UniProtKB/Swiss-Prot annotation:
Native species: Schizosaccharomyces pombe (strain 972 / ATCC 24843)
Gene Ontology BP, a term: mRNA processing
Function recorded in the entry: Subunit of the CTDK-I complex, which hyperphosphorylates the C-terminal heptapeptide repeat domain (CTD) of the largest RNA polymerase II subunit. As part of the CTDK-I complex, involved in RNA polymerase II transcriptional elongation and pre-mRNA 3'-end processing. Together with ctk2, required for ctk1/lsk1 CTD kinase activation.
Region (Disordered): 137-157
Subcellular location: Cytoplasm; Nucleus
CID domain mapped to chain residues: 2-138
Keyword Nucleus: yes
Regions that span the bilayer: none
Compositional bias segments (type: Polar residues): 141-152
Keyword Transcription: yes
Source domain of life: Eukaryota
Gene responsible for this protein: ctk3
Protein name per its UniProtKB record: CTD kinase subunit gamma
Family: Belongs to the CTK3 family.
Sorted UniProt keywords: Cytoplasm, mRNA processing, Nucleus, Transcription
Length: 218
């Protein structure tokens, strides 16, 4: 795939981003599949970010988290991960600018920053700097400095409410998801011997003792 075709396809996928997991995964898979175009595709993220609404920007922020997660799962280092960690403060400035839109996005930006920090995509200093940027913009918004922000439309607000519901639903589902067994537990399970005749005799003795205690108290 040539760079022009890759950019057009990727921009279309980014334009369809919303709170659903599918809309986040599809462009991430495309980006990973076409690593030879990673710089071109990364520039598309910024194009969409700088031209989109405040809802689009927060969806881009969540997409960045999804892309990093999929890179790590596929054993990919450098590339997208390095570019994202390098530009993390610039990313925050665009998603949570000073003003009403930035203030509305600030809580979501914090969640993504925490996730990226836990994944070690950004280091401690980058995390602190990015969080400080969010805090500074949020405080400036509360003080009334909204000169750099636009108004939020009613449709944008309604869309955000709907997408927040979808995100919270996914969070609840993830809480109940059963994670893969840890290596230590898996080793213990695989090395444990089966039940022997001696084990069965011991269980039988314990059961008889339990019944005796039960009858003694009745």
């Amino acid at each position: 795939m040539d760079p022009f075709e890759g950019r057009m396809t990727f921009l279309q996928l980014l334009g369809k981003l919303n709170a659903s997991q599918f809309s986040q995964i599809k462009p991430a898979q495309f980006a990973i599949k076409h690593l030879d175009l990673e710089e071109d595709l990364y520039s598309c993220i910024w194009e969409e970010l700088e031209s989109g609404s405040f809802n689009t920007r927060v969806n881009i922020m969540y997409f960045v988290d999804t892309l990093c997660e999929m890179c790590l799962k596929n054993g990919l280092t450098g590339g997208y991960l390095n570019m994202i960690s390098r530009d993390i403060c610039k990313l925050v400035q665009n998603v949570a600018p000073i003003g009403a839109a930035g203030a509305a996005n600030a809580p979501e930006v914090r969640k993504v920053l925490q996730s990226l920090h836990e994944k070690k995509v950004i280091d401690d200093n980058q995390y602190k700097d990015a969080m400080a940027t969010v805090e500074a913009h949020e405080q400036a918004s509360k003080s009334g400095d909204t000169s750099t922000s636009g108004a939020i439309s009613k449709n944008d607000i309604l869309k955000r409410i709907e997408e927040d519901r979808e995100r919270h639903k996914r969070m609840r589902e993830n809480i109940w998801a059963i994670s893969e067994p840890e290596l230590e537990a898996e080793i213990a399970w695989n090395t444990t011997q089966g039940i022997t005749e001696s084990d069965l005799e011991s269980l039988k003795d314990e059961y008889e003792k339990f019944n005796e205690c039960l009858h003694a108290t009745s």
